[in-house]
Swiss-Prot record:
GO MF annotations, alphabetized: metal ion binding; ubiquinol-cytochrome-c reductase activity
Organism: Connochaetes taurinus (Blue wildebeest)
Cofactor(s) annotated in UniProt: heme b
The keyword Heme appears for this protein: yes
Cofactor note: Binds 2 heme b groups non-covalently.
GO cellular component, one term: mitochondrial inner membrane
Name this polypeptide is given: Cytochrome b
Amino acid sequence: MTNIRKTHPLMKIVNNAFIDLPAPSNISSWWNFGSLLGICLILQILTGLFLAMHYTSDTTTAFSSVTHICRDVNYGWIIRYMHANGASMFFICLFLHVGRGLYYGSYTFLETWNVGVILLFATMATAFMGYVLPWGQMSFWGATVITNLLSAIPYIGTNLVEWIWGGFSVDKATLTRFFAFHFILPFIITALAMVHLLFLHETGSNNPTGISSDTDKIPFHPYYTIKDILGALLLILALMLLVLFAPDLLGDPDNYTPANPLNTPPHIKPEWYFLFAYAILRSIPNKLGGVLALVLSILILVLMPLLHTSKQRSMMFRPISQCMFWILVADLLTLTWIGGQPVEHPYIIIGQLASIMYFLLILVLMPAASTIENNLLKW
């Protein structure tokens, strides 16, 4: 008799995706982040659901409802901080997952990669709208500044912004719709993640060498299930250390002040995971130019398969490209630091140089390094 997991219509899907899936025998811990992102998403949906039970999306009560969650709801404080810091863990995993894809040439799986880029945009949109919900100073002014960027779009810009706001400023209508979108988007992300996985399983996983592993496959369970459980335990450990010992470490103190349209905070800045893009935005003196650079800083990922000039897929055996990759990582860390600094000398020029370096590395230096390595192979 055949095992039920191989015959049952529903269990068959689970079996082919998580149990009997043929996986390369040599994938490293950098391949753990997909499952960790899945865990982050489930955690965010669950904590978010319980927060939504007590939250009110009205400008007069939003701030106090969050205070009520933290003070009066049973374990409300831990749910709130797990949700806020869970977002940070989500983005740490996201950046490492994308970085892994860049390093090992996983972007040659075109559909998987492009769905992944859409997932990144959707997650960033969700996180931005979630940051607005507590209705603190940084929530209000962050929403005002970022939505205002759309006014840079020629001809329709101003109308578009007022349409998104639901009025002539960020107000009750804006908060209510942001809550609605913040609630629905994670489910859209879940659906996209399933599509992401569907496309991945059409080709099978990449591996550190970038060479086909069809001749050397092992079942996903128990080898990678146990490996993923270890990763999950480390993720939860890191999250709980953050939640229980330093819950406000990554937040902004300004968000503990209720939103006040008459008082602008001295430094308006987004959460840490958007700072690199924010630094690129600020480094261009022109509004439309800044907005385009901001969008392109992420959208440039779509071009990665076109910019791949190397004869090898992975960077494992390409020392010059490795060097370029780690310079790019250092550049992104520099941009993240600059994004959190005030707009004054020397931060302005550092930000501008780091922004130029970012696009130069991806569009020119990395493809050039690959071409040089191709020629060195002939020697």
